[in-house]
Amino acid sequence: MQVLKTIEELQNIRKNSLGKVGLVPTMGALHNGHISLIKQARNENDIVIVSIFVNPTQFLPGEDLDAYPRRDEADKKICQMCKVNYVFMPEISTMYTKEEVLVKAPNKSYILEGKTRPGHFDGVLQVVLKLFNLTQPTNAYFGKKDAQQLTLIQQMVKNFFLPINIVPCDIVREEDGLALSSRNIYLNPTQRKDALLISKSLYMAGSLISSGERSVKAVKDKIYEVMSILDVEYVAIVDKEFNELETIEPTNTIILVVARFGNTRLLDNIWL
């Protein structure tokens, strides 16, 4: 495994790479969710590149950029264990200049996550496009937990005619159902226990729909009821292009939940 720090190193490697290339973009602090993406990429490609870069442009003022967990040495060991070929770990000054041509996310980026974090998805798309241009992957792997981000990246690839296959990967959970997140380490024991109500509410919603419930309001009300002790930021029921639904479509629905635990935001969802 080789660790790359510069654009020149990465471009030279890519220029001489043959076969399928899989990219797994991350911000580090790798956990079993990331490992599942990396292992899938390893199974489906000749060369696997993992990027580790805490992207400043997707953080808003007052968010946890400086506090975001950084575990570079541990992350490199995980990548080596997963038989990654190249780890790209650039500095901010490598990825950004003072004058930048900007990527503007579409209107759907200003709902849900984007409503709470305006401009967040502009930064996400900016860095992902840079990584795509640098690595020119055959396949790029993203988790379904960040469902709105995944949908916007798919749209960017389509709009910019990028010859890249976006691979959506299932959410990985702890044994008790909590969706894996690098931010879970911020939770105290009480918050960690209460956070289980998020996945519990989603499982319950899925069960209701499996039993024939099609009312968006009825399902939302039940979710809020299960999470009544939590600081719920939003509950949304949308189709897979993030249009609001009047009636639940069992094979074309995503149910999303975000709750706050102090300064920590946790998001989760289920895809039907």
UniProtKB/Swiss-Prot annotation:
<feature type="binding site">
    <location>
        <position position="149"/>
    </location>
    <ligand>
        <name>(R)-pantoate</name>
    </ligand>
</feature>
<keyword id="KW-0566">Pantothenate biosynthesis</keyword>
<feature type="binding site">
    <location>
        <begin position="143"/>
        <end position="146"/>
    </location>
    <ligand>
        <name>ATP</name>
    </ligand>
</feature>
<keyword id="KW-0067">ATP-binding</keyword>
<feature type="binding site">
    <location>
        <begin position="27"/>
        <end position="34"/>
    </location>
    <ligand>
        <name>ATP</name>
    </ligand>
</feature>
<feature type="binding site">
    <location>
        <position position="58"/>
    </location>
    <ligand>
        <name>beta-alanine</name>
    </ligand>
</feature>
<dbReference type="InterPro" id="IPR014729">
    <property type="entry name" value="Rossmann-like_a/b/a_fold"/>
</dbReference>
<feature type="binding site">
    <location>
        <position position="58"/>
    </location>
    <ligand>
        <name>(R)-pantoate</name>
    </ligand>
</feature>
<dbReference type="GO" id="GO:0004592">
    <property type="term" value="F:pantoate-beta-alanine ligase activity"/>
</dbReference>
<feature type="active site" description="Proton donor">
    <location>
        <position position="34"/>
    </location>
</feature>
<comment type="pathway">
    <text>Cofactor biosynthesis; (R)-pantothenate biosynthesis; (R)-pantothenate from (R)-pantoate and beta-alanine: step 1/1.</text>
</comment>
<dbReference type="GO" id="GO:0015940">
    <property type="term" value="P:pantothenate biosynthetic process"/>
</dbReference>
<dbReference type="Pfam" id="PF02569">
    <property type="entry name" value="Pantoate_ligase"/>
</dbReference>
<protein>
    <recommendedName>
        <fullName>Pantothenate synthetase</fullName>
        <ecNumber>6.3.2.1</ecNumber>
    </recommendedName>
</protein>
<feature type="binding site">
    <location>
        <begin position="180"/>
        <end position="183"/>
    </location>
    <ligand>
        <name>ATP</name>
    </ligand>
</feature>
<comment type="function">
    <text>Catalyzes the condensation of pantoate with beta-alanine in an ATP-dependent reaction via a pantoyl-adenylate intermediate.</text>
</comment>
<dbReference type="InterPro" id="IPR003721">
    <property type="entry name" value="Pantoate_ligase"/>
</dbReference>
<feature type="binding site">
    <location>
        <position position="172"/>
    </location>
    <ligand>
        <name>ATP</name>
    </ligand>
</feature>
<comment type="similarity">
    <text>Belongs to the pantothenate synthetase family.</text>
</comment>
<comment type="subunit">
    <text>Homodimer.</text>
</comment>
<dbReference type="InterPro" id="IPR004821">
    <property type="entry name" value="Cyt_trans-like"/>
</dbReference>
<keyword id="KW-0436">Ligase</keyword>
<keyword id="KW-0547">Nucleotide-binding</keyword>
<dbReference type="GO" id="GO:0005524">
    <property type="term" value="F:ATP binding"/>
</dbReference>
<dbReference type="InterPro" id="IPR042176">
    <property type="entry name" value="Pantoate_ligase_C"/>
</dbReference>
<dbReference type="GO" id="GO:0005829">
    <property type="term" value="C:cytosol"/>
</dbReference>
<keyword id="KW-0963">Cytoplasm</keyword>
